Amino acid sequence: FFLKALQELGFEINISEEKKTVRIQGMNGRIPKKEATIQVGSAGTAARFLTAFLAMSDGTYQIESSEQMKKRPMKDLLLALEGLGASFAYLEEPYHFPMKVTGMGINTEKCSKIFLNIDQSSQFLSALLMVAPVCLGKLEIELTGHRNARSYVEMTQQMMMQFGHPGVRM
């Protein structure tokens, strides 16, 4: 679902079965299409990461999901993204898929300190960490909740450092 969604958003993707690699041509935080509908199915990782990515964009997108994903938690991530300036229109239940996302635009003025409850999922934090580079070092995340997700968060931060991002103050 993740790669298909990125293709729907207009990204150029090259897959080499032989080399077992996927190459996605980035655009410095920008999304090629300003409007699109994507499907995340039951993929929680794709759902959380893509929602954060779209929320930091300058477009409007609709995210569809499976019935199972509609029941999974998203509220704490969505509240944090609203704190950064994104807006959401819920097409069924509040704080659940399907939804329309209107991004905050690449606007570092809106980047500041946000609060994030990670009791229900560490993916919320990983999603915010991955979009943090758009804030040019101005994003500070204060964690609430007691979920022990250190290994996943460290994996996210290590991956980001491989791409040259110094990290986020938490």
PLM regions with names:
Residues 1-170:
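Structural preference for solvent-exposed beta-strand-turn elements
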